[in-house]
A protein has these predicted regions:
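Histidine-anchored nucleotide/phosphate-binding helix
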Residues: 1-3, 19-26, 225
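A residue-level signal for conserved active-site and pocket-lining positions in enzyme catalytic cores
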Residues: 36, 214, 246
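Glycine/tryptophan-enriched, flexible segments
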Residues: 100-243, 253
Length: 265
């Protein structure tokens, strides 16, 4: 993708010495570079190592906010103050909804009258009900290449290569997201907490892996899901329940990690 955008790319294999970030920074310095730019990896130890090595080599470091989260570190500082001893998820969730005007009516109140519809997310899955079918992406060049690479370079590692169930391209990821919106979103809220023996998906989105690796951004997922909800009369317990997983939990846990991660280790 980057090459298609005329970006010069140097690919570092996992078995190369430069796959160690400290060794890579040694190489960067030896080639005369005095400035590097990175996205925040949201990794306490990795950030420390990068900063320490850059200081050692007098390399200027410019850290950009990660597009994989809605909040910047500066945004999080308002809620996750060092002086606080306790952080409550519900308080954070409400503040995010208000600040971003997400599912808020013209009077500044939560749509539907409640901040959370968690109590409506606990229905049992109907006996005999067949869950919506998920269209697993077909095996493609990227999956085949990755499997061959893994077999060749990690022969002694545990596990085995089998059916790969996730999208690996932007187009596949968008199609996967659309499939959730069109076929599972409507009843997501009712069966969010349901468990059925021998079923692994039910009405869930399975979007976390795609957001975690950057194939979908949380901002895009939030905006598109809310827009779809309005146009298709998705129940409020489904819309709010889905939004809560991203801005109420994913962002909250990132904030906890950023503020207290080293302490919690």
């Amino acid at each position: 993708y980057l090459k298609s955008q005329d970006v010069k790319v140097s690919y570092i294999n996992s078995y190369d010495n430069e796959s160690n970030i400290l060794t890579l920074l040694d190489t960067v310095k030896s080639k005369g570079f005095n400035l590097i730019e990175i996205y925040d990896p949201v990794d306490y130890l990795l950030n420390r190592r990068i900063k320490r090595k850059c200081n050692e080599h007098n390399i200027d470091l410019l850290v950009h906010d990660s597009p994989q989260f809605l909040n910047s570190n500066e945004d999080l500082e308002d809620f996750f103050k060092e002086s606080k001893k306790k952080f409550f998820q519900t308080s954070f969730y409400k503040s995010e909804r208000k600040r971003r005007s997400i599912l808020i009516d013209s009077d500044g109140r939560p749509e539907g009258g409640e901040w959370t519809y968690d109590i409506l997310n606990r229905k049992k899955y109907p006996k005999g009900e067949i869950p919506p079918k998920i269209d697993i992406p077909k095996e493609n060049k990227y999956i085949k290449d990755s499997q061959s690479y893994t077999d060749e370079n990690f022969k002694e590692n545990y596990g085995k290569m089998g059916l790969f169930n996730y999208p690996v391209t932007f187009d596949e990821s968008e199609k996967w997201f659309n499939d959730f919106l069109e076929n599972r979103f409507m009843m997501f809220g009712d069966y969010e907490d349901a468990i059925v023996k021998e079923e692994i998906t039910l009405n869930h989105s399975i979007l976390s892996p795609l957001m975690n690796v950057g194939l979908l951004s949380p901002r895009h997922v939030i905006n598109k899901s809310i827009d779809f909800s309005k146009k298709n009369n998705i129940p409020i317990n489904s819309t709010e329940g889905f939004v809560r997983q991203i801005i109420g939990w994913r962002e909250f846990i990132r904030g906890i990690y950023t503020a207290k991660g080293s302490y919690e280790r």
